[in-house]
Amino acid sequence: DKLVDEAVSVTSRRYLTADVHTPWQIFHGLLALRHNFKLKINNEKSSAMKWVQSGPSYQGLPLIEQTVHGGRFHPFTVPYAFEGHPNQFLAILSMSELPRNFTFRAGNGATITVDDMLRNAQAECNDREEVTWTLWSFARYMHPGTQWNNRFGEPWSMERLVQTEVGKRVQEGACGGCHGLFALSLARNAYLQSGFQLQGAYLDADMKIKRYIAETRAYQNADGSF
C-alpha cells in the first residue's frame, strides 16, 4: 500500500538518540522497523539492534541483566523508561525473528542469549502479573504443547498462558486490549500451523479474536477510519 510505504519511509528518517531517548522509546522503534532501525550514537547513525546487543545502560542501570535462571531486560522502574510490562522487550525483539542463540551483553559482562531470556521468562511466569508479552514471546519461539514449572514449582504450559489471556477483559488491557488480542492471534496461528485442530483454550482464543474483529468492523467508517 502506497500510504503504508510512505509512512515507513517518513518514519525511517526520524532518528532517536542513545542516552537521550529511553530504552522504551527505542524498542518501539525496533518494533516498527526491526533490523532497519538506526539510532544516533555519538552523532553517527548506527544499528539499533547492535546497540541493544552491546549491553548499554540508561541512567546508570543496565539494559540487560543476568539472572539466576538466565537473563532479562531491565524490568519496570518508572513509566516509559525500561519495560512497561513483563517480557515486553523480548516480545518486541521476537518480531525480528532472532535465533534462540542470538547474543547480548549483560551489564556484568556476561553473554546472554534469547534462549536464556526465554528460560528466565518461564521461571518467572505467574498469574499475578500480565502474561500478554510472555505469551507473545513464547508463541514465536515455543511449540504449542510446551509445558514447564516456574521457579515456585507451579505447572505452566502454552495452553495455560492462552487460557489466562483469554480470561482477561479486553477493555482493561494495555492500549485498549490490542496487544492481548495480537498475542492470542500469534498463539492461535502457531497452534494451527503445527497441525492441530482448534480445541480447548485455543478454540476459546479463536472465538475471542473473531468476536473483536467483528466488533471493530462494526465501528469502521466507509473510508476505513474509526
Tell where the protein language model's regions lie, with residue ranges.
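Preference for long, amphipathic alpha-helical scaffolds in soluble/luminal domains
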Residues: 1-226
